[in-house]
C-alpha cells in the first residue's frame, strides 16, 4: 500500500514540474523578462499530499486500507484532470504569445520576405488595435467584462515588458579613483510609464464604479426607444435627445427617471467627470511630450513651402505680424471655426509654418521637450527684433490654444508623420499608450456629459 502511494506521488511530480514554469511566467506577464532557475526548480520540495495519506497506514486496519486507497486514487485522478486543464490553457496562452512576438519581430509581414514595417511602428499599431478590440464596442458607462479586462492587462503587460530592456548607461562612483558604469531605465520611460499605468488603473476604477446606476441606455431604433419606454418607470426621453446639435448617432441613448437623477447620483457623476478630465489632461501632456521628442522626418520637411506665410495664409500672417501684443484666443474667435475639420486644417497650417520659422532660426537641431517648448513661447520674444523668432513663438502659442480649445482634435499631419517614421520602440510604446488612454478618458467625459445633459433637460422640462 505504501508503494502504491509512493508511485502515485512520483506520477504527480512530472505534471507539476512541466506546468510550473508556464504558470510562473503568465501569472505575471512581466515574468517574460525573468530568467528561469532550473537548479532551484528541481530542488523544490515534492508534493506531500500522498505522503500524508501513506503516513497513517501503520495505524489503521487492513479493512480500512481499501477506502484509503480509493481516496488516494480519487484525489490523484481529480488532480490529474485539473493539471491537464491548466496545462492546456497555459499551452494555448503560450502559443498566442509566441505568435504575437513573432508578428512584432517580422513587422506584421508573416511571409518573412522583409517587407514589414519596423518594430516601433508594429508595436504602436498593436497597442492601437488592442484598444479597438477591448474598448471599441464599449460605448456606455459600465464596467468592462472580466474577459476584456484580463485581455487588456495581459496584452499591455506584454508590451510594457519591452521597456524593461530599454536602458541607458550612467557612471557610478565607488568613492575611489575607480568608476564603474551601471544601467537604468531610460529617463523618459522611467518617468512616463509608471504614470501611464496609474492613469490606466484610475480609468478602470472609474468604469468599475458605474455598477448600480439610476440611468440606463437603449439602442437607437429599438422598440423600447420608439415606444418611449426604456424598461423602467420613465421613457427614454427620445424627443429631447434628438434635438442635440452634437448628437452622435452611433451611441446608445442615455435615459433617466421621469423626475431626474438624485442629487447623490449627480454628485457622483460630476466627481467622476472631473477625475476623467484630469486623466485626459495628464495623458495628453505625456503624448505631446513624447511627440515633441521625436525627430521631424525629412519626408515632411520636403513638403513644406519656403515661407511660413504661404502655409498660414494672409489673414493669419497679418495678425501674427502686426499686433504689438498677440492674443491667440482673440485670433481664434475672429476665425470663427465651426467644425473639427476646420480646426484640424488650421492646426496643420500653423504647425507647418512653425516648423518653417524654426528651421530659419536654427531651432530644429535637436528635439525639445514640451516644457522647453513652452518656455520658448516667452523666451523667443525676448531675443530682440528677430522676426522669425517672434513668428515662431506666436505660432506655437496659437497652436497650443487651439489644442486646448478643441481637446478632441485628431492628430496633425506632422504627428502622424512622426509616428509613421519613428524607429524608437520606447517612444512608440509611450506615444501609443498615452494616446489610447487619452481617447478613453475623453470618451468617459463625453458619456458622463450625455447623461448629465439628459438629466438637466428632464428637470428643466418639469420646471
Curated annotation (Swiss-Prot):
Residues 84-463 form the PRONE domain. Its main location: cytoplasm. Residues 69-78 have a biased composition (Basic and acidic residues). Keywords: Cell membrane, Cytoplasm, Guanine-nucleotide releasing factor, Membrane, Stress response. Expressed in root vascular tissue and trichoblast cell files. Expressed in root metaxylem cell files. Expressed in guard cells of cotyledons, rosette leaves, sepals, petal, stigmas and siliques. Expressed in root metaxylem cell files. The keyword Plastid does not apply. One of its GO terms (cellular component) is secondary cell wall. This is Rop guanine nucleotide exchange factor 4. It comes from Arabidopsis thaliana (Mouse-ear cress). The lineage of its organism: Eukaryota, Viridiplantae, Streptophyta, Embryophyta, Tracheophyta. The gene is ROPGEF4.
Amino acid at each position: 500500500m505504501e508503494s502504491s502511494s509512493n508511485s502515485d506521488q512520483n506520477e504527480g511530480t512530472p505534471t507539476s514540474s512541466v506546468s510550473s514554469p508556464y504558470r510562473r511566467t503568465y501569472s505575471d506577464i512581466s515574468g517574460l523578462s525573468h530568467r528561469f532557475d532550473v537548479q532551484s526548480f528541481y530542488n523544490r520540495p515534492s508534493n506531500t499530499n500522498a505522503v500524508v495519506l501513506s503516513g497513517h497506514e501503520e495505524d489503521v486496519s487492513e479493512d480500512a486500507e481499501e477506502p484509503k486507497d480509493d481516496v488516494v486514487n480519487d484525489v490523484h485522478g481529480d488532480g490529474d484532470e485539473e493539471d491537464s486543464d491548466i496545462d492546456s490553457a497555459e499551452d494555448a496562452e503560450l502559443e498566442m504569445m509566441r505568435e504575437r512576438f513573432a508578428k512584432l519581430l517580422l513587422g506584421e509581414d508573416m511571409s518573412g520576405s522583409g517587407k514589414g514595417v519596423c518594430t516601433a511602428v508594429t508595436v504602436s499599431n498593436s497597442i492601437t488595435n488592442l484598444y479597438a478590440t477591448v474598448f471599441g464596442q464599449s460605448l456606455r458607462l459600465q464596467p468592462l467584462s472580466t474577459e476584456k479586462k484580463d485581455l487588456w492587462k495581459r496584452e499591455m503587460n506584454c508590451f510594457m515588458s519591452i521597456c524593461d530592456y530599454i536602458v541607458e548607461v550612467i557612471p557610478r562612483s565607488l568613492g575611489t579613483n575607480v568608476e564603474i558604469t551601471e544601467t537604468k531605465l531610460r529617463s523618459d520611460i522611467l518617468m512616463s510609464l509608471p504614470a501611464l499605468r496609474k492613469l490606466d488603473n484610475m480609468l478602470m476604477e472609474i468604469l468599475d464604479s458605474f455598477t448600480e446606476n439610476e440611468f440606463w441606455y437603449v439602442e437607437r431604433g429599438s422598440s423600447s426607444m420608439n415606444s418611449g419606454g426604456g424598461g423602467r418607470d420613465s421613457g427614454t426621453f427620445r424627443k429631447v435627445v434628438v434635438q442635440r446639435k452634437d448628437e452622435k448617432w452611433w451611441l446608445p441613448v442615455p435615459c433617466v427617471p421621469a423626475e431626474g437623477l438624485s442629487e447623490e447620483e449627480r454628485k457622483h457623476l460630476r466627481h467622476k467627470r472631473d477625475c476623467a478630465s484630469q486623466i485626459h489632461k495628464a495623458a495628453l501632456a505625456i503624448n505631446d511630450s513624447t511627440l515633441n521628442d521625436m525627430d521631424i522626418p525629412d519626408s515632411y520637411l520636403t513638403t513644406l513651402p519656403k515661407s511660413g506665410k504661404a502655409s498660414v495664409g494672409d489673414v493669419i500672417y497679418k495678425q501674427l505680424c502686426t499686433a504689438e501684443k498677440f492674443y491667440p484666443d482673440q485670433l481664434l474667435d475672429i476665425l470663427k471655426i465651426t467644425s473639427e475639420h476646420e480646426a484640424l486644417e488650421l492646426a496643420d497650417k500653423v504647425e507647418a509654418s512653425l516648423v518653417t520659422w524654426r528651421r530659419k532660426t536654427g531651432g530644429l537641431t535637436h528635439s525639445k521637450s514640451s516644457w522647453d517648448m513652452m518656455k520658448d513661447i516667452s523666451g523667443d520674444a525676448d531675443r530682440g527684433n528677430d522676426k522669425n523668432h517672434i513668428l515662431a513663438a506666436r505660432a506655437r502659442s496659437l497652436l497650443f490654444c487651439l489644442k486646448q480649445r478643441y481637446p478632441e482634435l485628431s492628430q496633425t499631419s506632422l504627428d502622424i508623420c512622426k509616428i509613421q517614421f519613428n524607429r524608437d520602440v520606447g517612444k512608440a510604446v509611450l506615444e501609443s499608450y498615452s494616446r489610447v488612454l487619452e481617447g478613453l478618458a475623453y470618451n468617459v467625459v463625453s458619456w458622463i456629459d450625455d447623461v448629465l445633459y439628459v438629466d438637466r433637460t428632464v428637470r428643466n422640462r418639469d420646471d
